[in-house]
Amino acid sequence: MFSSKENSLGAKRAPFSSNTTSSQRVAAQAAKRASSGAFAQLTSSQIQELKEAFALLDKDGDGNIGREDVKTMLTSLNQDASEDSINHMFESINPPINLAAFLTAMGSMLCRISPRNDLLEAFSTFDDTQSGKIPISTMRDALSSMGDRMDPQEVESILRSYTSHGVFYYEKFVDAIAGSKDSN
């Protein structure tokens, strides 16, 4: 029906010798899945943005980008463009990079960005004294008038557990939803 090196869809299988044990095959397949796991966690909008970035970096249109291209891109995205960061990216892939390898590498990098730090930074804009506390009136106003506005019942249910003496303890709130600073 089809050769032993093709699956039912006609795709080539990984070449294994007759001496390869089933545990070696499972380990090889697991390693392949793990490397694409970061890519699988990207949202469709992130994938689209990264495809556009890849196209911008691929100046000659050959479907590949090199180390300098990656450094330029990271710098333009305000990401870590140090030699260590770039070397880390290239530990598992060798330049030049095709689109699939680029998406996997960038997915891995984006997964390391801490949502905890992003949340703390957002809340700190309302914290004039950088004390980890925001006046409850400020939080009520922000949650009911900015972005995706919340109704008063939603605001109170969010603030209730993290409010004491008229202040919202946003660091405790962030710890609850994004993990404590000790877990990062």
Swiss-Prot record:
CDD domains: EFh. This chain binds calcium. Binds to myosin II chains myo2 and myo3. GO terms for cellular component: cytoplasm; cytosol; medial cortical node; mitotic actomyosin contractile ring; mitotic actomyosin contractile ring, distal actin filament layer; myosin II complex; nucleus. The keyword Calcium applies. GO terms for biological process: actomyosin structure organization; mitotic actomyosin contractile ring contraction; mitotic cytokinesis. Residues 45-80, 114-149 form the EF-hand domain. It comes from Schizosaccharomyces pombe (strain 972 / ATCC 24843) (Fission yeast). Keywords: Calcium, Cytoplasm, Metal-binding, Motor protein, Myosin, Phosphoprotein, Repeat. The modification Phosphoserine is found at S36. Ca(2+) binds at D58, D60, D62, N64, D69. Residues 1-29 are annotated as: Disordered. The lineage of its organism: Eukaryota, Fungi, Dikarya, Ascomycota, Taphrinomycotina. This is Myosin regulatory light chain 1. It is found in: Cytoplasm. It comes from the Eukaryota. InterPro entries: EF-hand-dom_pair, EF_Hand_1_Ca_BS, EF_hand_dom, Myosin_RLC. GO terms for molecular function: calcium ion binding; cytoskeletal motor regulator activity; myosin binding; myosin heavy chain binding. It holds the Pfam family EF-hand_7. Disulfide bonds: none annotated.
